[in-house]
From Swiss-Prot:
GO terms for molecular function: structural constituent of ribosome. Its main location: cytoplasm. Transmembrane segments: none annotated. This is Small ribosomal subunit protein eS1. Component of the small ribosomal subunit. Mature ribosomes consist of a small (40S) and a large (60S) subunit. The 40S subunit contains about 33 different proteins and 1 molecule of RNA (18S). The 60S subunit contains about 49 different proteins and 3 molecules of RNA (28S, 5.8S and 5S). GO terms for biological process: translation. The keyword Chloroplast does not apply. It is found in: Cytoplasm. The keyword Magnesium does not apply. Signal peptide: none annotated. It comes from Biphyllus lunatus. Keywords: Cytoplasm, Ribonucleoprotein, Ribosomal protein.
């Protein structure tokens, strides 16, 4: 026989009595997730967090959350070229009921990557660590595939090792040139139409023609010190509102001349 105290009897509770079930959602609040001004759709979605209770502050629980959103949703566009690209946004500050986010990375969907890899062609990949003018260290990955010449009768379109090395060098040069001279906002604006990949495809035509050239992934390795003023500037007026609507401000009321406030009977 086991020796020990019966916790149920010591507390005076009856054995088999069910505990009162409390819905956990009654202790939570909804917050609006706001994307930076580079994107057409600013309202990304909503997120849940437990209400402020004791030392646990709700806004602290929201910070550093990462949201992954399709570019088609961010740009409010059904274009197939945008649907397979995902942008990662990280929550950096909370203003009222608005969660202000910043760019945290980019990636292609797995199904798109798998569909591009085929037989009888060479896959060329390159990556570079580049620092932006505002102090962000980014690791950028690029991918491309050799294209078959229309006049060629050959089944394959394999590039020679020297050609692959030349194209890879060209990829790193263009990525470094386009990102090192831009701040994070300009980099995101270049990633939206994928202009860097188009420049690489055009520059590689003299070495070996390519197709399906994309910036495959962007990772944020290091960030500068957080500044609220820069984040608010990135969001425009979306974070200025208090607990009410975004950007909502009070209006000034003109008082008549000689106006005196009424005397209150009780305080």
């Amino acid at each position: 026989m086991a020796v020990g105290k019966n916790k149920g009897l010591s507390k005076g509770g009856k054995k088999g009595v069910k505990k009162k079930v409390v819905d956990p959602f009654t202790r939570k609040d909804w917050y609006d997730v706001k994307a930076p001004c580079m994107f057409a759709t600013r309202q990304v979605g909503k997120t849940l967090v437990n209400r402020t209770q004791g030392t646990k502050i709700a806004s602290e629980g929201l910070k550093h959350r990462v949201f992954e959103v399709s570019l088609a949703d961010l740009q409010n566009d059904n274009d197939a070229e945008r649907s397979f690209r995902k942008f990662r946004l990280i929550a950096e500050d909370v203003q009222g009921r608005n969660v202000l986010t910043n760019f945290h990375g980019m990636d292609l969907t797995t199904d798109k990557l798998r569909s591009m890899v085929k037989k009888w062609q060479s896959l060329i990949e390159a990556s570079a660590d580049v620092k932006t003018t505002d102090g962000y260290l980014l690791r950028v990955f690029c991918i491309g595939f050799t294209n078959k010449d229309q006049l060629s009768q050959r089944k394959t379109c394999y590039a020679q090792h020297t050609q692959v090395r030349s194209i890879r060098k060209k990829m790193v040069e263009i990525i470094t040139r386009d990102i090192s001279g831009s701040d994070l906002k300009e980099v995101v604006n270049k990633l939206l139409p994928d202009s860097i990949a188009k420049d690489i495809e055009k520059a590689s035509q003299g070495i070996y023609p390519l197709h399906d050239v994309y910036i495959r992934k962007v990772k944020v390795l290091k960030k500068p010190r957080f500044e609220l003023s820069k984040l608010l500037e990135l969001h425009g007026d979306s974070g200025k509102g208090g607990s009410g609507e975004p950007g909502e401000a009070g209006s000034k009321v003109d008082k008549p001349e000689g106006y005196e406030p009424p005397v209150q009977e009780a305080v």
